[in-house]
Amino acid sequence: MSSESSTEGDSDLYDPLAEELHNVQLVKHVTRENIDALNAKFANLQEPPAMYLIEYQELTSKLHELEAKEQELMERLNSQDQQEDSSLVERFKEQPHYQNQTQILQQQRQLARVHHGNDLTDSLGSQPGSQCGTLTRQPKILLRAHLPNQQRTSVEVISGVRLCDALMKALKLRQLTPDMCEVSTTHSGRHIIPWHTDIGTLHVEEIFVRLLDKFPIRTHIKHQIIRKTFFSLVFCEGCRRLLFTGFYCSQCNFRFHQRCANRVPMLCQPFPMDSYYQLLLAENPDNGVGFPGRGTAVRFNMSSRSRSRRCSSSGSSSSSKPPSSSSGNHRQGRPPRISQDDRSNSAPNVCINNIRSVTSEVQRSLIMQARPPLPHPCTDHSNSTQASPTSTLKHNRPRARSADESNKNLLLRDAKSSEENWNILAEEILIGPRIGSGSFGTVYRAHWHGPVAVKTLNVKTPSPAQLQAFKNEVAMLKKTRHCNILLFMGCVSKPSLAIVTQWCEGSSLYKHVHVSETKFKLNTLIDIGRQVAQGMDYLHAKNIIHRDLKSNNIFLHEDLSVKIGDFGLATAKTRWSGEKQANQPTGSILWMAPEVIRMQELNPYSFQSDVYAFGIVMYELLAECLPYGHISNKDQILFMVGRGLLRPDMSQVRSDAPQALKRLAEDCIKYTPKDRPLFRPLLNMLENMLRTLPKIHRSASEPNLTQSQLQNDEFLYLPSPKTPVNFNNFQFFGSAGNI
């Protein structure tokens, strides 16, 4: 009898179904942790590797199988539990207190479900055979957090965990820290919650995280990547190696190699340097930050320049000894804010620049003032243009004037070296096939540290006046940097004039509209016009007139980003007669403004003439055809447009175009230049139109409205990068030549 009871007790202690269920739960927990680890490492990548997708599919399918197995075992355990309950009731039915035993059993099971959750319950009573278990899952309590920039996340409410620790992972992914933000229970930010608050004590379902005013961070969802050749010493921010030809974001200035594209952060978020400097100045307003006060002299103690320092100190002491002593006492009483090394790195040394940049002109000007012969060149900067051997100086103004003169000489020297850096030798450029020709030159695809576009100008033998005008305009073009402007990379002056620009992977707007007949949506059409107006507004802010804006000079990338090319260069776009400019119109006929056709003024090109050409481009987009298609005689078009007798037919504009967009195009092509708006109000109107169009609003954290499942075969036929290793793959390798 005792042996039978012992075997029954062992069978009650060891349940094979419960043991199997426990093992399945452990394997499912490990599988879920593997999936979370894979997602944390590869889910943020725009193009995850194929091995990650395969492993993710295998783990998810395995997880589904384990969940099905767990459900099956739980059903079997429940059925076995019911059978044991029925047998238990029959066994104790003869006893008078069996009803009380049944009630106690049910109460103990309910307590076991609450306290143990998914685990097996312990023994429920002292009676043998009363041990049985139920498996239930306790629901998780989540707290929704609204993050800055219209993003949100959810965290599990666990007692004992601080609020900053619960949100730390979400903040780090967005390059934020708790010091930059504050938490409140309302959207207005009235009820502030401390970061060290226990998350289990919060009695709200959602919280709001917003940035503090002293740390404004402009965040963009999408980077504006631009290919660039860096002529200065630049390092990749992904691998920290030297970067020569690569990419950078025009918004956050993140620079990287092509092979380091997977290290680019998901959010375009520039570092708030201006706010950081403002915060430093606000904390200590008396800090001079290296700027000397009025009547004080600046001392730079550098061991390598001790000789120049001795020369400058001797000259200044002989000319003005009392002010130097007072300033010295002032410096002894108040220590400097910034060390000498930091000052020498942040700004140029005035004494060193004066020594290095003393030219013959300054020496001649000093000799003309009947000064005694100088024993050493380093004493030039200490003497003033209005001082004499017998005069005394009351302040250090003459020294500042000599510093200004030396800075001018330094700027002239830097401008000369910078001009030489932008000049490209014709032997360095590998000319490829001819792409096209226009009214001012011919465009070739070429290779110069990467694919570039070379436009040889029609000015074959430039005169000195033409060459000087060309250099002046190149000096203006090399300062243009904008996301809607083709990047100017350099120029060639010998044997013929040519400019080197960024190569645009795409086709022109003219080809899209009139050759391929691409049907743009209305919001896409307005966005193209907005980008063109934005680029032209930037050029006009730089005092650059395009002179030949047309759909052939507007290029579209695959993502419909706009690049404006062939801007500026009035030297090449002007007819020359010997050493003088000829008074003849240049450009394309259909996009010429009436005042340009008439040529009644010496220089009829203005900002309004570019606005007229922009109006014709907008008419092409709206009507999907060229203006004046019913007239084949060019002279007739020139005469009628110049007299104001011919205007584009606005009845051919697409029917779904809003009236405001039609009025905008009509205002741009008005006959009188003063009646045409400039690009700044045009840009504002186009942005308002694009903002008021009905569209599907989507969250900033999920920019893609529909997420397509990536397949494994999408990663099998990726094109190889255009690097110098694959040099034989260039199309122009067989027909190489020089300018």
From Swiss-Prot:
Residues in Phorbol-ester/DAG-type zinc fingers: 222-268
Ranges annotated as biased composition (Polar residues): 380-393
Biased composition (Low complexity): 311-328
Residues engaged in binding Zn(2+) 2: C236, C239, H257, C260
One Pfam family linked to the record: PK_Tyr_Ser-Thr
Cofactors (names): Zn(2+)
Catalytic residue positions: D548
In-chain residues carrying the UniProt-annotated modification Phosphoserine: S346
Top enzyme class: transferase
Catalytic activity: L-seryl-[protein] + ATP = O-phospho-L-seryl-[protein] + ADP + H(+); L-threonyl-[protein] + ATP = O-phospho-L-threonyl-[protein] + ADP + H(+)
Cellular component per GO, a single term: plasma membrane
Positions of transmembrane segments: none
Phenotype caused by lack of the gene: RNAi-mediated knockdown in the prothoracic gland (PG) delays the onset of pupariation by prolonging the L3 larval stage.
Post-translational modification: Extensively phosphorylated 1 to 2 hours after egg laying.
GO biological process: border follicle cell migration; cellular response to starvation; compound eye photoreceptor development; dorsal appendage formation; dorsal/ventral axis specification, ovarian follicular epithelium; epidermal growth factor receptor signaling pathway; epithelial cell migration, open tracheal system; ERK1 and ERK2 cascade
E.C. numbers: 2.7.11.1
Coiled-coil ranges per UniProt: 50-86
Domain RBD, chain residue ranges per copy: 141-212
Top-level taxon in the UniProt lineage: Eukaryota
GO molecular function list: ATP binding; kinase binding; MAP kinase kinase kinase activity; protein serine kinase activity; protein serine/threonine kinase activity; zinc ion binding
Annotated spans, Disordered: 301-352, 371-410
Biased composition (Basic and acidic residues): 401-410
Family recorded in the similarity comment: Belongs to the protein kinase superfamily. TKL Ser/Thr protein kinase family. RAF subfamily.
Complexes and interactors: Interacts with Dsor1/MEK1 and ksr; Dsor1 binding to ksr probably promotes ksr and Raf dimerization and ksr-mediated Raf transactivation.
Physiological role: Serine/threonine kinase required in the early embryo for the formation of terminal structure. Also required during the proliferation of imaginal cells. May act downstream of Ras85D in the tor signal transduction pathway. During larval development, mediates Ptth/tor signaling leading to the production of ecdysone, a hormone required for the initiation of metamorphosis.
Name of the protein in its database record: Raf homolog serine/threonine-protein kinase Raf
Organism: Drosophila melanogaster
Gene: Raf
